[in-house]
Amino acid sequence: ILVQTAPAGPIDVLIGRPALQRPDIAPRHHAPPHRAEREAVEADRSRRTAGDGWGFAGLRQLPAHAGGQHQQGREGQEKASGRRHVRCHIPLCALSVHTTMHTHALSGIATDGHRRFRRRHLCRPRAS
């Protein structure tokens, strides 16, 4: 990235303001303070859903404790759209998991889920 540094003018020198912060060199765009945080979250999400093969990002965002509960609505939507299976989120496993197995397939850390479906999967339960 080429940063254009203008020579500091007399007022800038007086104030001790670096050339880059001068108003005549406008920053590309003023982001609200929460934007960096939001981008970090999105980057993390895309990292977790990368290689998913389905591009179904929203489903992965279940909290770890949501394992045992019935994920109402999510399954219904999927069945309506004709998608019965999703990919396992565990690296190197990548097996197709039925949408009812949300614990295993979709939550970020569902240790009991791993243990429960270990037979049917290449993945190992996380060491606790």
From Swiss-Prot:
Keywords for the protein's UniProt record, in alphabetical order: Amino-acid biosynthesis, Histidine biosynthesis, NAD, Oxidoreductase
UniProt-annotated stretches for the region Disordered: 21-84
Pathway entry: Amino-acid biosynthesis; L-histidine biosynthesis; L-histidine from 5-phospho-alpha-D-ribose 1-diphosphate: step 9/9
Enzyme kind, highest EC tier: oxidoreductase
GO terms of biological process kind: L-histidine biosynthetic process
GO molecular function: histidinol dehydrogenase activity
Catalytic activity: L-histidinol + 2 NAD(+) + H2O = L-histidine + 2 NADH + 3 H(+)
Annotated Basic and acidic residues bias: 34-50, 72-81
Listed EC numbers: 1.1.1.23
Family classification: Belongs to the histidinol dehydrogenase family.
The protein's role, per its UniProt record: Catalyzes the sequential NAD-dependent oxidations of L-histidinol to L-histidinaldehyde and then to L-histidine.
Protein name per Swiss-Prot or TrEMBL: Putative histidinol dehydrogenase
Organism whose genome encodes this protein: Azospirillum brasilense
